[in-house]
Amino acid sequence: MLDRIKVCFTESIQTQIAAAEALPDAISRGAIAMVQSLLNGNKILCCGNGTSAANSQHFAASMINRFEAERPSLPAIALNADNVVLTAIANDRLHEEIYAKQVRALGQAGDVLLAISTRGNSRDIVKAVESAVTRDMTIVALTGYDGGELAGLLGPQDVEIRIPSHRSARIQEMHMLTVNCLCDLIDNTLFPHQND
């Protein structure tokens, strides 16, 4: 058992090292897209399933409340946070519409959709991205493995932050770190002296 614990830590560290080499440009571009959207008076919608839903809610909470320093609230909505809306849509329509319908209702040109999917193949996340494209929104996608179907939907203005791993647990750990990096970059760009 102790050896297995060391393997988990070692894999996580190796994935972090690989991500630190591969992802800074994509994370920076994702943060810039979000900052520009917020400066233009727009908002960030985010969604995910399971652990990705938790990362989505963590991002929205960090925008609305604060990340590490006190600052004004920033507009972000975790589409997976309202169980009444989710179950109403799932009950009346296909489950794959639970986020897409909300994107069509709430999304506007200039908004950002933060779409989080470990494999990039979750139908409800794919449908949300397709709806965001029709609303002229920018997509920042957090993926892993080969990026899945999600990667093929992204245009030149969109950003894929693909974790260099084929292990779901490692990808999800890195998604949380990436969300924290995005929050840090947004805060330090919009409020550069708040952490002083």
UniProtKB/Swiss-Prot annotation:
Keyword terms of this UniProt record: DNA replication
Native organism: Pectobacterium atrosepticum (strain SCRI 1043 / ATCC BAA-672)
One BP term from GO: DNA replication
InterPro entries: DiaA, GmhA/DiaA, SIS_dom, SIS_dom_sf, SIS_GmhA/DiaA_subfam
Protein name, as recorded: DnaA initiator-associating protein DiaA
SIS domain boundaries: 34-196
Protein's gene: diaA
Domain of life of the native organism: Bacteria
Gene3D superfamilies: Glucose-6-phosphate isomerase like protein, domain 1
Function noted in UniProt: Required for the timely initiation of chromosomal replication via direct interactions with the DnaA initiator protein.
GO molecular function, one term: carbohydrate derivative binding
Assembly and interaction partners: Homotetramer; dimer of dimers.
Pfam families: SIS_2
Protein family: Belongs to the SIS family. DiaA subfamily.
